[in-house]
Amino acid sequence: TAGAAFTICFFVTFVIHFGGTIAIIALIGLAVFMLIRSQVMYKKRKEKEKGNATIKQLMQSTDNMEILELLRKHTREELGKILEFTEDNFERTVTAFLHENLRGLRRAMGSVKFEKQLIKQMKRTGTLAMCRLDNNTVLEKGLYYYQGNDFASELVYSVGRLCEPCLEHIDNNFKPLDTIQKGEFADVTEDIVYLLQVCRHKLENNNYNNFEEDIHKANDLNGQLAHLKREELQRIQSQSGSIKVSMVYLTMIQEAQNIVTYSINLMKVSRKFQAEE
Protein backbone atom coordinates (compact mmCIF):
# COMPACT_ATOMS: atom_id res chain seq x y z
CA THR A 1 0.00 0.00 0.00
CA ALA A 2 2.82 2.39 0.90
CA GLY A 3 4.59 1.52 -2.34
CA ALA A 4 1.47 2.20 -4.38
CA ALA A 5 0.94 5.54 -2.63
CA PHE A 6 4.57 6.53 -3.27
CA THR A 7 4.25 5.57 -6.95
CA ILE A 8 1.06 7.60 -7.38
CA CYS A 9 2.59 10.65 -5.66
CA PHE A 10 5.67 10.39 -7.87
CA PHE A 11 3.51 10.16 -10.99
CA VAL A 12 1.37 13.17 -10.00
CA THR A 13 4.46 15.25 -9.18
CA PHE A 14 6.07 14.24 -12.48
CA VAL A 15 2.98 15.22 -14.47
CA ILE A 16 2.60 18.57 -12.69
CA HIS A 17 6.31 19.37 -13.10
CA PHE A 18 6.26 18.90 -16.86
CA GLY A 19 2.64 19.79 -17.56
CA GLY A 20 2.26 22.89 -15.43
CA THR A 21 -1.16 24.54 -15.13
CA ILE A 22 -2.73 22.43 -17.89
CA ALA A 23 -1.69 19.24 -16.10
CA ILE A 24 -3.16 20.49 -12.81
CA ILE A 25 -6.49 21.29 -14.49
CA ALA A 26 -6.49 17.89 -16.19
CA LEU A 27 -5.81 16.09 -12.89
CA ILE A 28 -8.61 18.02 -11.17
CA GLY A 29 -10.95 17.10 -14.01
CA LEU A 30 -9.94 13.45 -13.71
CA ALA A 31 -10.53 13.52 -9.95
CA VAL A 32 -14.00 15.04 -10.41
CA PHE A 33 -14.84 12.45 -13.07
CA MET A 34 -13.74 9.57 -10.83
CA LEU A 35 -15.76 10.97 -7.92
CA ILE A 36 -18.93 11.30 -10.01
CA ARG A 37 -18.44 7.85 -11.50
CA SER A 38 -17.97 6.38 -8.04
CA GLN A 39 -21.21 7.99 -6.82
CA VAL A 40 -23.16 6.70 -9.83
CA MET A 41 -21.84 3.16 -9.36
CA TYR A 42 -22.66 3.31 -5.63
CA LYS A 43 -26.21 4.42 -6.38
CA LYS A 44 -26.69 1.60 -8.91
CA ARG A 45 -25.32 -0.95 -6.46
CA LYS A 46 -27.70 0.24 -3.74
CA GLU A 47 -30.66 0.03 -6.14
CA LYS A 48 -29.68 -3.51 -7.08
CA GLU A 49 -29.35 -4.51 -3.43
CA LYS A 50 -32.78 -3.02 -2.75
CA GLY A 51 -34.32 -5.08 -5.57
CA ASN A 52 -32.56 -8.23 -4.38
CA ALA A 53 -33.87 -7.63 -0.85
CA THR A 54 -37.45 -7.54 -2.14
CA ILE A 55 -37.00 -10.80 -4.03
CA LYS A 56 -35.27 -12.42 -1.06
CA GLN A 57 -38.16 -11.45 1.21
CA LEU A 58 -40.63 -12.71 -1.39
CA MET A 59 -38.94 -16.10 -1.66
CA GLN A 60 -38.89 -16.53 2.11
CA SER A 61 -42.53 -15.58 2.70
CA THR A 62 -45.28 -18.20 3.02
CA ASP A 63 -48.19 -15.75 3.04
CA ASN A 64 -49.86 -15.55 -0.39
CA MET A 65 -51.02 -11.92 -0.07
CA GLU A 66 -47.61 -10.78 1.14
CA ILE A 67 -45.96 -12.57 -1.78
CA LEU A 68 -48.34 -10.89 -4.23
CA GLU A 69 -47.70 -7.44 -2.76
CA LEU A 70 -43.94 -7.97 -2.85
CA LEU A 71 -44.16 -9.16 -6.45
CA ARG A 72 -46.22 -6.09 -7.34
CA LYS A 73 -43.60 -3.87 -5.73
CA HIS A 74 -40.76 -5.66 -7.51
CA THR A 75 -42.64 -5.44 -10.82
CA ARG A 76 -43.16 -1.69 -10.49
CA GLU A 77 -39.44 -1.26 -9.88
CA GLU A 78 -38.36 -3.44 -12.80
CA LEU A 79 -40.87 -2.16 -15.36
CA GLY A 80 -40.10 1.41 -14.31
CA LYS A 81 -36.45 0.77 -15.14
CA ILE A 82 -37.42 -0.60 -18.55
CA LEU A 83 -39.47 2.50 -19.35
CA GLU A 84 -36.59 4.70 -18.18
CA PHE A 85 -34.19 2.74 -20.40
CA THR A 86 -36.56 3.13 -23.36
CA GLU A 87 -37.00 6.84 -22.73
CA ASP A 88 -33.24 7.49 -22.47
CA ASN A 89 -32.06 5.31 -25.33
CA PHE A 90 -34.84 6.13 -27.77
CA GLU A 91 -34.01 9.81 -27.36
CA ARG A 92 -30.26 9.13 -27.45
CA THR A 93 -30.52 7.06 -30.63
CA VAL A 94 -32.64 9.59 -32.50
CA THR A 95 -30.56 12.57 -31.38
CA ALA A 96 -27.29 10.82 -32.25
CA PHE A 97 -28.60 9.80 -35.67
CA LEU A 98 -29.95 13.24 -36.54
CA HIS A 99 -26.58 14.77 -35.56
CA GLU A 100 -24.57 11.95 -37.20
CA ASN A 101 -22.98 11.07 -33.86
CA LEU A 102 -21.49 7.60 -34.33
CA ARG A 103 -20.19 7.42 -30.76
CA GLY A 104 -23.64 8.13 -29.34
CA LEU A 105 -25.18 5.39 -31.48
CA ARG A 106 -22.54 2.88 -30.39
CA ARG A 107 -23.20 3.77 -26.78
CA ALA A 108 -26.94 3.24 -27.27
CA MET A 109 -26.33 -0.11 -28.97
CA GLY A 110 -24.14 -1.21 -26.08
CA SER A 111 -26.90 -0.26 -23.64
CA VAL A 112 -29.39 -2.34 -25.64
CA LYS A 113 -27.18 -5.43 -25.51
CA PHE A 114 -26.75 -5.07 -21.75
CA GLU A 115 -30.48 -4.48 -21.20
CA LYS A 116 -31.36 -7.64 -23.14
CA GLN A 117 -29.42 -9.66 -20.58
CA LEU A 118 -31.24 -7.91 -17.74
CA ILE A 119 -34.58 -8.72 -19.39
CA LYS A 120 -33.71 -12.42 -19.45
CA GLN A 121 -32.77 -12.28 -15.77
CA MET A 122 -35.99 -10.42 -14.93
CA LYS A 123 -38.09 -13.07 -16.67
CA ARG A 124 -36.31 -15.92 -14.89
CA THR A 125 -36.78 -14.25 -11.52
CA GLY A 126 -40.43 -13.55 -12.30
CA THR A 127 -41.13 -17.16 -13.20
CA LEU A 128 -39.68 -18.32 -9.87
CA ALA A 129 -41.70 -15.69 -8.01
CA MET A 130 -44.97 -16.69 -9.70
CA CYS A 131 -44.44 -20.26 -8.50
CA ARG A 132 -44.73 -18.94 -4.93
CA LEU A 133 -48.34 -17.82 -5.47
CA ASP A 134 -51.36 -20.07 -5.06
CA ASN A 135 -53.15 -21.40 -8.15
CA ASN A 136 -56.13 -19.04 -7.93
CA THR A 137 -53.90 -15.97 -7.82
CA VAL A 138 -51.80 -17.25 -10.72
CA LEU A 139 -54.95 -17.82 -12.79
CA GLU A 140 -56.24 -14.35 -11.94
CA LYS A 141 -53.02 -12.31 -12.25
CA GLY A 142 -50.47 -14.49 -14.02
CA LEU A 143 -51.45 -13.54 -17.57
CA TYR A 144 -51.11 -9.81 -16.85
CA TYR A 145 -47.72 -10.35 -15.25
CA TYR A 146 -46.29 -12.31 -18.16
CA GLN A 147 -47.78 -9.93 -20.72
CA GLY A 148 -46.11 -7.05 -18.90
CA ASN A 149 -42.75 -8.78 -19.14
CA ASP A 150 -43.32 -9.49 -22.83
CA PHE A 151 -44.16 -5.87 -23.62
CA ALA A 152 -41.11 -4.74 -21.62
CA SER A 153 -38.95 -7.09 -23.67
CA GLU A 154 -40.45 -5.77 -26.91
CA LEU A 155 -39.60 -2.22 -25.88
CA VAL A 156 -35.94 -3.12 -25.46
CA TYR A 157 -35.83 -4.97 -28.77
CA SER A 158 -37.60 -2.09 -30.55
CA VAL A 159 -34.90 0.32 -29.39
CA GLY A 160 -32.35 -2.16 -30.73
CA ARG A 161 -34.13 -2.46 -34.09
CA LEU A 162 -34.18 1.34 -34.26
CA CYS A 163 -30.54 1.79 -33.30
CA GLU A 164 -28.96 -0.90 -35.47
CA PRO A 165 -29.82 0.51 -38.95
CA CYS A 166 -29.09 4.05 -37.75
CA LEU A 167 -25.65 2.95 -36.55
CA GLU A 168 -24.94 1.12 -39.79
CA HIS A 169 -26.10 4.13 -41.84
CA ILE A 170 -23.78 6.58 -40.08
CA ASP A 171 -20.90 4.10 -39.85
CA ASN A 172 -20.98 3.71 -43.64
CA ASN A 173 -21.14 7.48 -44.21
CA PHE A 174 -24.40 7.23 -46.12
CA LYS A 175 -26.33 10.38 -46.98
CA PRO A 176 -28.10 11.84 -43.89
CA LEU A 177 -31.79 12.64 -43.59
CA ASP A 178 -32.84 15.87 -45.25
CA THR A 179 -33.89 18.92 -43.26
CA ILE A 180 -37.61 18.18 -43.56
CA GLN A 181 -37.24 14.60 -42.34
CA LYS A 182 -35.06 15.69 -39.42
CA GLY A 183 -37.54 18.34 -38.36
CA GLU A 184 -40.54 16.02 -38.63
CA PHE A 185 -38.99 13.23 -36.61
CA ALA A 186 -37.40 15.50 -34.00
CA ASP A 187 -40.82 16.98 -33.20
CA VAL A 188 -42.58 13.64 -32.79
CA THR A 189 -39.62 12.25 -30.80
CA GLU A 190 -40.04 14.99 -28.21
CA ASP A 191 -43.70 14.03 -27.75
CA ILE A 192 -42.90 10.31 -27.51
CA VAL A 193 -40.24 10.90 -24.85
CA TYR A 194 -42.72 12.97 -22.85
CA LEU A 195 -45.32 10.18 -23.10
CA LEU A 196 -42.74 7.67 -21.84
CA GLN A 197 -41.94 9.93 -18.89
CA VAL A 198 -45.62 10.26 -17.97
CA CYS A 199 -46.14 6.49 -18.23
CA ARG A 200 -43.09 5.75 -16.10
CA HIS A 201 -44.13 8.10 -13.31
CA LYS A 202 -47.63 6.63 -13.22
CA LEU A 203 -46.32 3.08 -13.17
CA GLU A 204 -43.73 3.75 -10.46
CA ASN A 205 -46.29 5.50 -8.26
CA ASN A 206 -49.02 2.97 -9.08
CA ASN A 207 -51.30 5.87 -9.95
CA TYR A 208 -53.22 5.49 -13.20
CA ASN A 209 -55.40 8.59 -12.90
CA ASN A 210 -56.25 10.15 -16.28
CA PHE A 211 -54.65 7.19 -18.05
CA GLU A 212 -57.30 7.42 -20.78
CA GLU A 213 -55.75 10.75 -21.78
CA ASP A 214 -52.40 8.99 -22.27
CA ILE A 215 -54.08 6.37 -24.46
CA HIS A 216 -55.62 9.16 -26.54
CA LYS A 217 -52.21 10.87 -26.82
CA ALA A 218 -50.60 7.60 -27.92
CA ASN A 219 -53.23 7.17 -30.62
CA ASP A 220 -52.55 10.71 -31.83
CA LEU A 221 -48.80 10.02 -31.95
CA ASN A 222 -49.29 6.83 -33.94
CA GLY A 223 -51.52 8.80 -36.29
CA GLN A 224 -48.76 11.38 -36.79
CA LEU A 225 -46.22 8.64 -37.44
CA ALA A 226 -48.56 6.95 -39.94
CA HIS A 227 -48.83 10.31 -41.73
CA LEU A 228 -45.02 10.58 -41.88
CA LYS A 229 -44.88 7.06 -43.30
CA ARG A 230 -47.37 7.92 -46.06
CA GLU A 231 -45.42 11.06 -46.95
CA GLU A 232 -42.17 9.10 -47.17
CA LEU A 233 -43.73 6.44 -49.38
CA GLN A 234 -44.92 9.22 -51.69
CA ARG A 235 -41.34 10.55 -51.84
CA ILE A 236 -40.15 7.09 -52.86
CA GLN A 237 -42.79 6.85 -55.59
CA SER A 238 -41.83 10.26 -56.94
CA GLN A 239 -38.13 9.25 -56.79
CA SER A 240 -37.31 12.53 -55.07
CA GLY A 241 -34.80 11.15 -52.59
CA SER A 242 -32.30 8.44 -51.71
CA ILE A 243 -33.74 4.93 -51.27
CA LYS A 244 -31.22 4.15 -48.50
CA VAL A 245 -32.28 7.24 -46.59
CA SER A 246 -35.96 6.42 -47.09
CA MET A 247 -35.50 2.84 -45.84
CA VAL A 248 -33.79 3.87 -42.61
CA TYR A 249 -36.35 6.63 -42.10
CA LEU A 250 -39.26 4.22 -42.55
CA THR A 251 -37.62 1.87 -40.04
CA MET A 252 -37.36 4.73 -37.54
CA ILE A 253 -41.03 5.52 -37.99
CA GLN A 254 -42.08 1.88 -37.60
CA GLU A 255 -40.07 1.33 -34.42
CA ALA A 256 -41.29 4.62 -32.97
CA GLN A 257 -44.86 3.38 -33.52
CA ASN A 258 -43.95 0.09 -31.84
CA ILE A 259 -42.48 1.89 -28.83
CA VAL A 260 -45.62 3.99 -28.40
CA THR A 261 -47.90 0.95 -28.72
CA TYR A 262 -45.86 -1.35 -26.47
CA SER A 263 -45.59 1.35 -23.79
CA ILE A 264 -49.35 1.84 -23.62
CA ASN A 265 -49.99 -1.91 -23.68
CA LEU A 266 -47.46 -2.34 -20.87
CA MET A 267 -49.33 0.26 -18.83
CA LYS A 268 -52.67 -1.43 -19.46
CA VAL A 269 -51.57 -4.86 -18.23
CA SER A 270 -49.58 -3.34 -15.36
CA ARG A 271 -52.71 -1.55 -14.16
CA LYS A 272 -54.61 -4.84 -14.20
CA PHE A 273 -51.81 -6.70 -12.39
CA GLN A 274 -51.54 -4.02 -9.70
CA ALA A 275 -55.31 -3.68 -9.20
CA GLU A 276 -56.69 -4.78 -5.84
CA GLU A 277 -59.67 -7.05 -6.48
Where are these regions (language model features)?
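Composition- and surface-driven signal marking solvent-exposed, interaction-prone regions
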Residues: 10, 22-28, 107-110
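Hydrophobic core of alpha-helical transmembrane segments in multi-pass integral membrane proteins
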Residues: 26-38
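Transmembrane helix-loop junctions at the membrane interface of multipass transporters and ion channels
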Residues: 3-23
